Amino acid sequence: MNLLREYIREILLTESVDPKIMSMIDELEKNGGYAEVFPDRVILFQPTENTPRRWVAMVAYDTVVGAHAGGRCGGAESVVQSATAKTGLGPLAYDIAIELTGGLGMISDRASVSSDARAVWDYYMNNRPDVIKQQLDNTNDLLTPEKDDNCEQEIEGTGGTAVDMFPDNPRAWIKSSLSKLYKKSGTPVMDELRKRGMLR
């Protein structure tokens, strides 16, 4: 019986849109907006009379190999290169970008992350049961002997590697949302946007 409940829960999570993301879709639609997918970025537009292609949020990414992410990074498809939002719709752009990886996942920029972007990653780690979190290792194999999960971990500050920044507890960095790979098993956000005619 527990397995059946777990299975049903998993189906519901992969088929449903997070309520906060749904409210962002509603807001974008109310303002005549839409999402456009490019080979290297997702941009949310809210047109105005004077500016028909007025953008309000953007997440740009590169392949893990193209970004020289420093390892296989758990098989991640892409790494965020930059993100910006003029409104509170940034997380919607992130969700679309994660879904575009086809279940392979996305990681944060490996060199620097703004406080706004960190808040998005923290939210994914702590509040999004529909998003799969996978712990990454550093390039010195601190957590596992396997190489597939190795990924640069220098994003926790500017004093060397993440492990160097916690000399008394080298495993402390694993609590960081930036040391994870994030992926989704379905595309409910893109499906909802497509259903509303808001995905280009």
Regions found by a protein language model. Give the residues of each.
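Secondary-structure junction/capping motif
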Residues: 2-3, 88, 114
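Protein-protein interaction and targeting regions used for scaffolding, dimerization, and localization
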Residues: 1-16
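Terminal substrate-recognition subdomain of acyl/acetyltransferases
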Residues: 17-30, 36-65, 69-73, 102-200
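A generic structural micro-environment signature
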Residues: 7-10, 86, 95, 199
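Conserved acetyl-CoA-binding loop-helix of GNAT-fold acetyltransferases
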Residues: 83-100
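Extended, structured, electrostatic nucleic-acid-contact surfaces
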Residues: 73-85
